[in-house]
Amino acid sequence: MMNKSILLMGTLLVSASVEIAAQKNSENPNIVFVLADDMGIGDLGCYGQKKIKTPNIDKLAEKGLLFTNHYSGSTVSAPSRCSLLTGKHTGHAYIRGNKGIKSEEGFFDLHLPSDEVTVAEILKRKGYATMCVGKWGLGGPHTTGSPVKKGFDYFFGYLSQGAAHRYYPEYLYENEDKVMLNKKVYSHFLIMEKGLDFIRKNAGHPFFAYFAITPPHADLDYPDLSQYEDAFPETPYINNKQKGFKTQMKPKAAYASMVSEIDKNVGQIIQLLKEKGILENTIIIFSSDNGVHCVGGHEPDFFDSNGPYRGYKRDLYEGG
């Protein structure tokens, strides 16, 4: 059994759908899909979280639909994203694990073949502008699995899911070209900036904005821990090896900060949609790719991150 993932849909899913059904000439709704990385169902206030503040997502849940029987496609990143974008059960999907392959440009995940159709390709045929920012994980640059060859007009972020463990990367990809950051930029901030800019530029016609953001996946790395710095008893996570996750002296504060950052981002998206006058014609969906992780210093039991369910990421139980 797979993870009960987090899926929230705003009230506008219902209102927009009803209006479109009633009026043949209605404008197609915009679609915003925010996919968190390794977030547990219990990490949000609307699912019972008491220690981490998520007011924007909680409000979205209050006014929308709260899914309690929705399962992710897999217990790890790449196959879950493959199922999400192709609509296929993992048993029929092309990508069924986080297996990677080497190329001249680096180490990337298995790439989707040309005959695999994504939801972005379908929406693009219907006149949608399409975007993916964040983690891709379904193929490297200049392959059939590149996002710009799978229906996305614009991509910015990590093409390799394995590279997305580092929040201060050497580079990110814009479409299929490297953008050098030299390990000096917190990637998530730049990824969100690019995604919001896409909405600004495309507010005049239907769009599909897929925010495949990387928090709260380990590394537990966030530049400002002040919101939760002294809120919890901490057990430092120390890794002196060259491989593995980054040392974090306050892992609980870091994890909570990353979850609250995601909540802030959802608020930013909603505010921008309001400013552009398109909120009432936009479907907003929030989910996680799989269950909560328990690496890099994160203690899921402290936050009750998996809620009432058994297991964590990689486990074949509903918490994973």
Task: Map each language-model feature to its residues.
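Active-site-proximal cap/lid insertion segments
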Residues: 26, 38-52, 68, 72-75, ...
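Catalytic cores of carbohydrate-active enzymes across secretory and cytosolic contexts
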Residues: 134
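Local beta-strand N-terminus motif with an aromatic residue
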Residues: 29, 128, 152, 281-282
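N-terminal carbohydrate-binding accessory modules
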Residues: 23-29, 58, 63
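Active-site segment of extracytoplasmic enzymes that catalyze sulfate/phosphate-ester chemistry
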Residues: 41-131, 150, 154, 160-165
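Bacterial Sec-dependent N-terminal signal peptides
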Residues: 1-26
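Amphipathic alpha-helical repeat scaffolds
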Residues: 30-34
